[in-house]
């Protein structure tokens, strides 16, 4: 299962590749489970939108768009994001945004055109390097320049949602998430205080509590406890 370090690796990889790219169209192979948005919302807020940033909070990725919407992605147990290049093509996308229809062509992307490599991250299996889409592909996003982003998920626990950017922080699980272990402002003292609030619980479940520390799962909880020479069933 991708945990915080793996999801951060995906964020960094996509942050180098996606900003500036314009969405031309999508193909959803597992609707509505993996991508529950209504087609009208996808057409209005995703088609023709330009990627502005790729962010992460805990194990959740956010691809921000210039429509003030974001693609929010949770890889869960077996999720992957795979970016592939292909021959460039021209596409025209009309949307009924409040600012009016716009035509998106290859020239719309020309100011950020560059030669780059493919990227893949998430759960390790053959879909990271194989032909796509395959049987695990849930969502395919085509960009105006011909590149594509595939959301693969073998077990179908992961999801992708299109949400207003300013509403993402209000999602229930986002409001409960604790401090980021990679944030330089996160102090060991604060972490210890949060752990101590779980009095009489075993220390490993306390590590796995996302309200205590963000993004830690079984792998890194085990590694941290091994490094500290603490048994997972030690009481807080």
Locations of regions flagged by a protein language model:
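Extended, highly charged segments
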Residues: 1-69, 86-89, 96-97, 102-103
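Basic, nucleic-acid-binding surfaces and adjacent catalytic neighborhoods in DNA/RNA-processing proteins
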Residues: 22-45, 55, 192-236
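Phosphate/anion-contacting hairpin/loop surfaces
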Residues: 74-214, 220-221, 225-227
